[in-house]
Amino acid sequence: MNKKVAIESCPSYDPDLIYAALKRAVELAGDLDVAGKSVLLKPNIVFDAAPEKAICTHPAFLEAAIRLVREMGASRILVGDSPGLPPPGFAGKVSGLGEVTKRNNAQWVDFSREKMELNYPEGKAQKKFTVSRVLQEADVVISLPKLKTHQLMYFTGAMKNLFGLIPSVTKSTYHVRFPERESFASMLVDLNLAIRPAYAFMDAITGMEGPGPSGGDPRHVGLVLASSNLLAVDVAASIIIGYPPKELPVNKDALERGVWLSSFDEIEYPGLSPLEKQIPDYVKIIFKKSNWQLLEFILPRPLRKLRLSFAPKPKIDHSACIRCGDCLRICASKAMDIAETGGERRVIIDYRRCIRCFCCHEICPEKAIFVK
């Protein structure tokens, strides 16, 4: 397994600058073969949001990626993602990703159109996944994540981005099945091993800090990352924003598998080093180990639910809420409703049912749901 991660400076979303940075990064990291192959580019689209909000992979970044893989000989280029609540015929209009795809003669694909079962008998947490049938059309899968914090997983990068290959609300069933961070991380690692993505181009030109992956604030970082080793990309990115990589659940579980790396020290940086580009004041999700988290592996499963009484929970800012109902539709445990309270209709949460997956926080277009 290639252990090189190339980190290159890129000060803005000028398509030519991004293309040049991506090309240099791929040349340094090596190991990308797309000649004569069908390539699926998988950007990160939590929901269809404008580029300046830093919620989605930037359209100019996608444009540079399309240009690069085409010049490297790709025979067909597919682009798509499946947000949590995609409207019928979802086409990435607000984010600009659909228009860029069309303008560059790539093919926008609907992940929700058809599903298939993807078996992975060696799975530690999950041995079968329901994924988009688009996977069958791709010889090469390239993850195009956005560098962001994440309320549930602390950080989201190249590996977490592939969760979007599970169509729309089907993702909610995995949150119910794997409500703890550690078990959810194991499932994500199994998914990556089942899909076997070939490469990652990370959009770290403008990242998101604070309560990501959608409720945080844009933060200029000025970098692009590239490698065929998705774990190594995520380790490098987590160092850049100031996380100890071994403390992040996906990194930790993936390292234990020994497939991508046997030690974080094995990673080679032929370009910039993540430590020299580290941003000490990047606003992160605070990593805390409560006594309840430490007891999760000792207590019987029914008693583990007691920890939820002490865990952070989603709360509603009623002054910002527009009662669009997206949070109700995404809630896997059916813990949310709109009811008459105090003389007005409000979103309410039944914390006895809430599993603290924070999908409601992630999907809210008005930043009206926060975690406390």
PLM regions and their residue ranges:
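N-terminal and secondary-structure boundary signal
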Residues: 1-322, 328-332, 337-344, 351, ...
